[in-house]
Structures are given as structure tokens and as C-alpha cells.
Amino acid sequence: MRTVLLWAGLLAMSGCATKPEAGAPPRESLKAVVESLAGEATRLSPGTDLSLAVMDLRTGETASVSGLEPHISASSAKVFWVAAALGQRDLATVTPLAEKVFRTSDNEASGEVIDLVGGPDAINVYLRGLGLEHTALTKWNYGRERWATNSPRVMGRDNYFCADDMVSFLARLDRRELLEPEPTAQLLKWMELTPREGCGGWLGTRLPVSARASLQHKGGWLPPGCCGDDARYNVLNEVGLVTLPDGGRYAVAILASRGPDWPKQAFFVERASCVLYRHLAKDAALDCGEALARAGGPAPIVLEPGAPAPNYDCE
């Protein structure tokens, strides 16, 4: 059974904090919500390997499930690489590449961003400097071959990260601890160039319109049929910063992989994003696909023997 960890707990609150109404049931903790979602994943997307981490940036309350488990990072890691480039190069140099990275997840532009930093080894030095010990760039061969000599290769030839590392990074980005004010603001704006919903925008699909519009995120996907071994890949990651109605924000990483049914895995990620928002926004009326969840998620995809998988790439 997965272990659910409460990293930081609640920061000290002022003595004038609003008290719950007399007789009202105690509010469910973020830890309990995350634990419930982990249980749902086994029912809604059997076979999916899930890691999830979330931090309420208003209070510091943070919970995770399998938060240190390594996952293939796919394109979600590109936010690390652009941040590293902004720490070394001026905005004018980074901007043309970063806009492609976030607008269309351009892989060749991402390789050029890695080159701006000094190559894969330099990216890993940057990550270690931030204390992200469970994240590494191993190779990036778009445009040309790039191999790291200092990757621990925890996942063989694949690039990887973990949910806890990503949420830690996003929280520090939001607190303006990683970069100077101007590049920080620009990186956050670039994170709004990504899809708002649907393929590549799973984090926003079931959020209210206002939250979807202001969403700052980066999806990463390696869908069935893309990479030669669906049992290893079928990667669907979403990482980002979400704004709540009171102006507060939270950082979230939902990492799902290896699920044999892509639509079921995608539905779970969309629903998990919505359920977390509903809890943190205290919006009990928000529909996170309840009827579909009660039905077990989307109908299973059944393929004839030898038939190719549907094209689930974001084109």
C-alpha cells in the first residue's frame, strides 16, 4: 500500500483565524484527500503507476503519495530546463526558444535550451544545486545527440523526476526564490501558453473557467504506441500552479504512467486535479466527473489482436 506523507503540516496560523461552525463536521485534511485519490486510481485506471504531490502555498500544508518514486519525466521536465537557462542567459536569448517549448512542447527548441545551459551535465548540476536529488536529465537527442555523464540513470536511458521534487521546485518558483523578478514573471507567463484543457491540458480540463484561464503548467506525455514499450511508458504527467478564488495558489504534480487504458488514465488525472481544487477552494458544488467516476471512468478500449493503438498524441 502506498504511503501517504504529510511533509510540512500547517504553518502557524493567527489567533483570529475563523473557527468552524458549531456542530459542523471536521474539515477533511489534504492528506486524506490525496489518500482517497490514490485509492480511486486503482479503481478508475487499473494498472496505472501514480505519484501525486500538492502544496497549499497559503499555509504550507503539503501531502504526497509515492512522492519520491521516480517517474519518466517526458516534457514536464522542460520547466526545469527553461528556469536553468533563465538563470544564465538574458531574456532576449531564451524567449524565442521558451515560447516554442511551452506553446507546442517543441522538442528541438528544448534541446537548444539545454545547450544554452551548457548541456545535460550542466542541467543536472543545476538540479542538484536546488536539492532535487530524485530528478535527472539522462539524454535528449532531438536535433542532435546529448548524453549526460553525471545522471544516476535511476530509470536507465530515460529522463526522470519525482512528484515531491517538482512541487518543491514550483513552490520556490512561486515564492520568487529561484530567479530574479523579471525572469520569474516571464517564466510564469510562458507556463500560460500551454493548452488549457484536453490533450496537453489535462490539469485544467475540469477546473472552473477562471482557474483554467490562469493555470500555469506543463504537461508531459508518452502515449501508447509512441515508444516501443507501453508497459514501461504510457506516461501522462501534469505539473503546475493553480490559482484559487481567494487569490491563494497551490503547486501540484500528478504523475501517471503504465496504465494500459489511456482514456481511463487521462480521466483520472483530470479528475484528481479537479478534486484537489474543490478541496482547496472549498467549492463543494464543483462537479469533478462524479457520474463518470461512479461508472468506473470511460468505457474500456478494446482492440482486436494486433490492431494498433489509437493515436493519442497531442497534435
Where are the regions that the model predicts?
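Short, well-structured active-site flanking segments
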Residues: 87-100, 105, 120-123, 180-183
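Hydrophobic helical h-region of N-terminal Sec-dependent signal peptides
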Residues: 6-10
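C-terminal motif of bacterial Sec signal peptides marking the signal peptidase cleavage site
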Residues: 13-15
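A short glycine/serine-rich beta->alpha loop
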Residues: 64-71, 152-155
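Positively charged n-region of N-terminal signal peptides that target proteins for export
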Residues: 1-4
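Bacterial signal peptide processing site
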Residues: 17-19
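Active-site SXXK
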Residues: 60, 70-92, 101, 252
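Penicillin-recognizing serine hydrolase domain
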Residues: 25-50, 55-59, 114-315
